[in-house]
């Protein structure tokens, strides 16, 4: 069971480990975070069996401080529209079923999509309990971040968000295999090989978040669910209630998270995304030993231990664990954030890599990878992506908006060549100027010499948006001006004029897409064009292949 002299993950030895008494930590109150304060305050989209284990966790490992009875926040009750706009009625699209879980701010239900019969989880957050503007922003930001990260195979996929007079409903894929937390309790600790595989998944999520300008801030085993109870590696990160967007070098000061996992710089109120790597290091230590590296009988005692940073590698089972594993933990739990491994460096560590072989090159930054994909598209597909981008909701593109603002350093509303070059290099790119110029020209569809906001969104939007029928149909109808069901040469020419596209051979566009050689493009041919060459289109889409190295930016780590 690991180091039983200092407590266990099951809480069978030291109750002080399981329930810290000192609640002096001023952790952030966040209504959209289902698991951020108590393991029984759970919005997780899981099965009944998992939810029934919550009373057990209250007596096994309380990882966070209790909520304050009152909040010292200013602000009025929530705005009428938390999401800022009207949405369809969720009951027109889904049938809500049995309750999966109950939290302080709402309830998670099983829901069934009326049109397909597919099952999802619906987290319904009570608007009555959103008592300040900050509460509203927390919920709105969680939805934005879930949309921004959608497509990564180890992050729960958001299906949609809806609002009625009483609730905000977040519909997402259902994960019925239980929590990683419960697996740790059942096993005590994992073998090194299994722990390495799980760490690769968890740190892969961290890298994906950081690469897209998101800091998680509350990683812990309860926030990872299993899609399939028979597969330990079918992990999904499920709770982004404390997550925030960040820019390279940005410093955060609010103390949030969970005591056993919190990084020392968070307690010192001066931190950035490297705090997530510390937290992942704590999880790795627990996976291998069954106990947290920093433990005490009170919450303040835990914080004191974190600030001292002493890691116990002497007690059982550490003498039997490889030096390579210990080396990785030391480098993830380095007290100096600037000297701590980045998420990408963790994934390249010999203990993590299969057969001890690290990747021979850095992965492309996400924005760079998407720009490369965009540059290879034909003119019609580029215009169609612009049309689709303009139809996306605010919450779907909020993350890309933040990235655009980070690159548009003079706030002109357009990214120049120098800004694109500086932005890509700040985020980890090593492209030559000529290569950056080629990407610039590809994204600058209207040949203005800069990339405006609409062009940036079109060029960097995740291609999983092309799965959605309503987006494809809307784009097709944009080009099919006369509603004939076909896109003709004249209609392509008209669209090019509207988008200020020059040097376009209209007949060549038609010829490339027209599969039946009738001189026009029908809807099926249009869809085939839009999905051709999209890597891993569908639920298998991995954003690991689209890594934006904000983690490597000066001042970000």
UniProtKB/Swiss-Prot annotation:
GO terms for molecular function: ATP binding; calcium ion binding; calcium-dependent protein serine/threonine kinase activity; calcium/calmodulin-dependent protein kinase activity; calmodulin binding; protein serine kinase activity. Its EC number is 2.7.11.1. It is a lipid-anchor. Residues 395-430, 431-466, 467-502, 506-536 form the EF-hand domain. It catalyses: L-seryl-[protein] + ATP = O-phospho-L-seryl-[protein] + ADP + H(+); L-threonyl-[protein] + ATP = O-phospho-L-threonyl-[protein] + ADP + H(+). SMART domains: EFh, S_TKc. InterPro entries: CDPK_Ser/Thr_kinases, EF-hand-dom_pair, EF_Hand_1_Ca_BS, EF_hand_dom, Kinase-like_dom_sf, Prot_kinase_dom, Protein_kinase_ATP_BS, Ser/Thr_kinase_AS. A lipid is attached at residue 2 (N-myristoyl glycine). Residues 28-48 have a biased composition (Low complexity). GO terms for biological process: intracellular signal transduction. Ca(2+) 3 binds at residues 480, 482, 484, 486, 491. Ca(2+) 2 binds at residues 444, 446, 448, 450, 455. The active site is at 218 (proton acceptor). It is found in: Membrane. Residues 358-388 are annotated as: Autoinhibitory domain. Activated by calcium. Autophosphorylation may play an important role in the regulation of the kinase activity. Belongs to the protein kinase superfamily. Ser/Thr protein kinase family. CDPK subfamily. There are 3 contiguous domains conserved in the CDPK subfamily: a kinase domain, an autoinhibitory (junction) domain and a calmodulin-like domain. The autoinhibitory domain (358-388) inactivates kinase activity under calcium-free conditions. This is Calcium-dependent protein kinase 4. It comes from Solanum tuberosum (Potato).
């Amino acid at each position: 069971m690991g180091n039983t002299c200092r407590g266990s993950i099951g809480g069978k030895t030291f109750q002080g480990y399981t329930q810290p008494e000192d609640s002096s930590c001023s952790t952030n109150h966040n209504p959209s975070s289902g698991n951020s304060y108590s393991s029984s305050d759970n919005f997780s989209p899981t099965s009944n069996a998992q939810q029934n284990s919550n009373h057990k966790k209250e007596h096994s490992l309380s990882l966070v401080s209790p909520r304050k009875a009152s909040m010292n926040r200013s602000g009025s009750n929530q705005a009428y529209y938390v999401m800022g706009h009207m949405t369809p009625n969720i009951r027109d699209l889904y049938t809500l079923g049995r309750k999966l879980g109950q939290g302080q701010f709402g309830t998670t239900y099983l829901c069934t999509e009326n049109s397909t019969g597919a099952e999802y989880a619906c987290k319904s957050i009570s608007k009555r309990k959103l008592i300040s503007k900050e509460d509203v922003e927390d919920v709105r930001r969680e939805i934005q971040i879930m949309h921004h990260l959608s497509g990564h195979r180890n992050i729960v996929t958001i299906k949609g968000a809806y609002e009625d007079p009483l609730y905000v409903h977040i519909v997402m894929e259902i994960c019925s295999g239980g929590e990683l937390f419960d697996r740790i309790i059942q096993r005590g600790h994992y073998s090194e090989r299994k722990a390495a595989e799980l760490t690769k998944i968890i740190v892969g999520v961290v890298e994906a978040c950081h690469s897209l300008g998101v800091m998680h801030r509350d990683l812990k085993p309860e926030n990872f669910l299993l899609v399939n109870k028979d597969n330990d590696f079918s992990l999904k990160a499920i709770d982004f209630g404390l997550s925030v967007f960040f820019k390279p070098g940005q410093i955060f000061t609010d103390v949030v998270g969970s005591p056993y996992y919190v990084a020392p710089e968070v307690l010192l109120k001066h931190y950035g995304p490297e705090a997530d790597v510390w937290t992942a290091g704590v999880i790795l230590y627990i996976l291998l030993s069954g106990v947290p590296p920093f433990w005490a009988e009170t919450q303040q005692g835990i914080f004191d231990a974190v600030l001292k940073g002493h890691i116990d590698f002497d007690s059982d089972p550490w003498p039997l664990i490889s030096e390579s594993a210990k080396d990785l933990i030391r480098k993830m739990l380095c007290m100096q954030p600037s000297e701590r491994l980045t998420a990408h460096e963790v994934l390249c560590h010999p203990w993590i890599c299969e057969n001890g072989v690290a990747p021979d090159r850095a992965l492309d930054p996400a924005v760079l990878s998407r720009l490369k994909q965009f540059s290879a598209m034909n003119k019609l597909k580029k215009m169609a992506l612009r049309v689709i981008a303009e139809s996306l909701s605010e919450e779907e593109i909020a993350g890309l908006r933040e990235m655009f603002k980070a690159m548009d350093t003079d706030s002109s509303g357009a990214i120049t060549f120098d800004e694109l070059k500086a932005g890509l290099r700040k985020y980890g790119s090593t492209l030559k100027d000529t290569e950056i110029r080629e990407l610039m020209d590809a994204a600058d569809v209207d040949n203005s010499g800069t990339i405006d906001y609409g062009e940036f969104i079109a060029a960097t939007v995740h291609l999983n948006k092309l799965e959605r029928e309503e987006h494809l149909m809307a784009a097709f109808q944009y080009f099919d001006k006369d509603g004939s069901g076909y896109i003709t040469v004249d209609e392509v020419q008209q669209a090019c004029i509207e988008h200020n596209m020059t040097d376009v051979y209209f007949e060549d566009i038609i010829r490339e897409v027209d599969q039946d050689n009738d001189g026009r493009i029908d809807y099926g041919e249009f869809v085939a064009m839009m999905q051709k060459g999209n890597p891993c289109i569908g639920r298998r889409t991995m954003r690991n292949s689209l890594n934006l190295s904000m983690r490597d930016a000066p001042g970000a780590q």
